[in-house]
């Protein structure tokens, strides 16, 4: 049974978060380089009167890939259609989506790395030549049919760039990587969210929520809602640092944004395997969590925060992780950390 706190599980979608979504690129906070480039590409496409080139967003869950896709459609003044890789089970599903698109429409496919090979093959000519190549019938009576499509823009999102085949990856003219947000960016997002919810929040209260949001706007919005609930029940009109700290502590989110499952992950490596190296499959078995969830949701933030290193022999805790757990680090871990002897696994 999973111990992950759904309040800060960035892999889940909550409809109520839609009210906090920015509506334009100017409103969108963070990802400055990506936003600046997208503005140029969108404006150029509008000047040319053509469909925007296909866009691939890469990054951990909750950083704004879906929101950016929606904003792009609005900025282009076209329709927005959304689906995900697992939903498109067969070629006919994709054909139905593509044939219903109008000129320059934006089609968003989340988790595109989970498309089946058969569906992916259909997507190649659709992206490159705006044509569908379909086989009608079976056996000797089978025939190939070409269907012309409206010139559309495919915006795709993935958390696992390495799982995309090279032919598919190379067909995206605008690959864009999204990174974790800074505390300052998240603090602005929290203040904006509180304003939308008509809830007062002090600067130190906003900072406390931002610090514990794992660098992820979706989590910041979710935590803000729960902190607001605690504040309302306590009869407070303003969320200050004390209320935010008490609420987040009760939600088991520590001062570095780690939840119960993150700490179990670190403790398994520290207490059961002396800090590592240990393989991902062993960790997954110890946590009773799928490997994909660990690699997509837990590890990116731990690596980014300096708690974990991935080496050719497995996962290894850093001195920072040992300190956070309140445990003495082995001498070799301290030495290796000081001299940077670990090599990142590709």
From Swiss-Prot:
Annotated region described as Head domain (RuvB-H), given as residue ranges: 255-346
Any GO CC annotation of this UniProt entry: Holliday junction resolvase complex
Region (Large ATPase domain (RuvB-L)): 1-181
Principal location: cytoplasm
Residues binding DNA, per UniProt: 291, 310, 315
GO molecular-function term, one example from the UniProt record: ATP hydrolysis activity
Enzyme class, spelled out: hydrolase
EC code: 3.6.4.-
GO biological process, one term: DNA recombination
UniProt KW keywords: ATP-binding, Cytoplasm, DNA damage, DNA recombination, DNA repair, DNA-binding, Hydrolase, Nucleotide-binding
Position of the signal peptide: none
Domain notes: Has 3 domains, the large (RuvB-L) and small ATPase (RuvB-S) domains and the C-terminal head (RuvB-H) domain. The head domain binds DNA, while the ATPase domains jointly bind ATP, ADP or are empty depending on the state of the subunit in the translocation cycle. During a single DNA translocation step the structure of each domain remains the same, but their relative positions change.
Protein family: Belongs to the RuvB family.
Name of the protein in question: Holliday junction branch migration complex subunit RuvB
The organism of origin for this protein: Brucella anthropi (strain ATCC 49188 / DSM 6882 / CCUG 24695 / JCM 21032 / LMG 3331 / NBRC 15819 / NCTC 12168 / Alc 37)
């Amino acid at each position: 049974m999973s111990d992950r706190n759904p309040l800060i599980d960035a892999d889940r979608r909550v409809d109520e978060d839609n009210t906090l979504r920015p509506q334009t690129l100017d409103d969108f906070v963070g990802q400055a380089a990506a936003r600046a480039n997208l503005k140029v590409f969108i404006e150029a496409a509008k000047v040319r009167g053509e469909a925007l080139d296909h866009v691939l967003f890469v990054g951990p869950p909750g950083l704004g890939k879906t929101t950016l896709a929606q904003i792009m459609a609005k900025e282009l003044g076209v329709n927005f259609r959304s689906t995900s890789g697992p939903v498109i089970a067969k070629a006919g599903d994709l054909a139905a989506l593509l044939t219903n698109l109008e000129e320059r429409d934006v089609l968003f496919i989340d988790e595109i790395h989970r498309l089946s090979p058969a569906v992916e093959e259909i997507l190649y000519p659709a992206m490159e030549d705006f044509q569908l190549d379909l086989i009608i019938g079976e056996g000797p009576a089978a025939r190939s049919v070409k269907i012309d499509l409206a010139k559309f823009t495919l915006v795709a999102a993935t958390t696992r760039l390495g799982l995309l085949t090279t032919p598919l990856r190379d067909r995206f003219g605008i690959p864009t990587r999204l990174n974790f947000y800074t505390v300052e960016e998240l603090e602005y997002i929290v203040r904006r969210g509180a304003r939308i919810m008509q809830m007062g929040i002090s600067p130190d209260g906003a900072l406390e929520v931002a610090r514990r949001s794992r660098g992820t706007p979706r989590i910041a919005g979710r935590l803000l809602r729960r902190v607001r609930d605690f504040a309302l029940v306590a009869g407070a009109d303003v969320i200050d640092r004390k209320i935010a700290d008490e609420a987040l502590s009760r939600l088991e989110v520590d001062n570095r944004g780690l939840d119960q499952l993150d700490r179990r992950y670190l403790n398994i490596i520290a207490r059961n395997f002396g800090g590592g190296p240990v393989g991902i499959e062993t960790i997954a078995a110890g946590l009773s969590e799928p490997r994909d969830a660990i690699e997509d949701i837990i590890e990116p933030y731990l690596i980014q925060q300096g708690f974990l290193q991935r080496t050719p022999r497995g996962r290894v805790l850093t001195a920072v992780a040992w300190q956070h757990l309140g445990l003495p680090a082995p001498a070799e871990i301290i030495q290796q950390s000081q001299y940077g002897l670990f090599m990142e696994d590709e």
